């Protein structure tokens, strides 16, 4: 993750007050660019290979937590729950599991009077980019957590961002502009670790049962012809309803008034007869 490269660049200035990680003149790694977190969809590098072996062959954990940098301006740390819309191909139990972990993490910071946690619409992070350490875990039904926290060895200032000052669902406990030290970031990270460990220890049986349930559902779905409703098809259905919004659509072929996924697929492609009443 560029650790030695960034460290050497930071330490190049003898004046400790002028040290900075800015304007690094080269990529961290010539094959994968910014850092090895971008390599988990290919596992091309030895670091990501070894981590994937641990995660998906040796351990198969229920939770994976990736600490990263940096947080959005006017906050301290961005984390789960992530912004909408989430990737609809995942099991809903996985998504609500991520939300539950996020609630435990933000609540822990609030209880310890540590403001500045942002989530949902307050963050740019989602579940859609699927090449990183925590997002590839979703395809294994593992609760993947990512936090992006501010801070570096040189003290910094949390800037004034007016839109961040009023509490809302994205940032329920805003932080005021202030001087920020590296120790503060470490303290926050430790609290977040304890929040995850506390949740895992208290809800061990539930987490184990949930990953079993998600795995069984995946196997069952793979053993039959299974369809996923995509936004394109739901948009087509919305257009049909919009065109006939003052009428009702009655499906003639379905005696039980239940539309199966394969039937709905044909219906949205206009291959199924329906009657407007």
Question: Residue locations for each model-derived region?
Answer:
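Structured catalytic-domain cores with a bias toward divalent-metal coordination
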Residues: 1-277
């Amino acid at each position: 993750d560029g650790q030695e490269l960034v460290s050497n660049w930071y330490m190049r200035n003898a004046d400790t007050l002028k040290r900075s990680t800015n304007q690094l003149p080269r990529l961290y790694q010539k094959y994968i660019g910014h850092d090895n977190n971008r390599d988990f969809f290919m596992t091309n590098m030895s670091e990501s290979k070894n981590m994937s072996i641990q995660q998906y062959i040796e351990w198969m954990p229920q939770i994976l937590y990736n600490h990263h940098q940096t947080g959005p301006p006017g906050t301290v740390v961005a984390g789960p729950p992530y912004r909408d819309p989430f990737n609809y191909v995942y099991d809903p139990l996985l998504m609500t599991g991520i939300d539950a972990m996020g609630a435990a993490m933000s609540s822990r910071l609030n209880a310890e009077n540590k403001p500045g946690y942002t989530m949902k619409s307050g963050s740019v992070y989602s579940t859609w980019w699927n090449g990183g350490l925590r997002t590839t875990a979703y395809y294994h039904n593992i609760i993947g957590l990512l936090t992006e926290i501010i801070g570096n060895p040189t003290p910094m200032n949390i800037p004034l961002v007016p839109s961040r000052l009023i509490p809302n669902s994205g940032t329920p406990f805003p932080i005021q502009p202030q001087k920020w030290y590296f120790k503060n970031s470490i303290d926050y990270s430790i609290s977040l670790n304890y929040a995850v460990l506390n949740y895992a220890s208290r809800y061990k049986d539930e987490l184990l049962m949930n990953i079993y349930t998600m795995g069984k559902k995946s196997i069952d779905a793979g053993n039959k012809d299974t369809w996923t409703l995509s936004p394109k098809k739901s948009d087509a259905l919305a257009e049909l309803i919009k065109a006939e919004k003052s009428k009702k659509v009655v499906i003639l072929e379905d005696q039980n008034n239940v539309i199966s996924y394969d039937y709905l697929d044909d219906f949205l492609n206009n291959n199924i007869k329906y009657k407007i009443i």
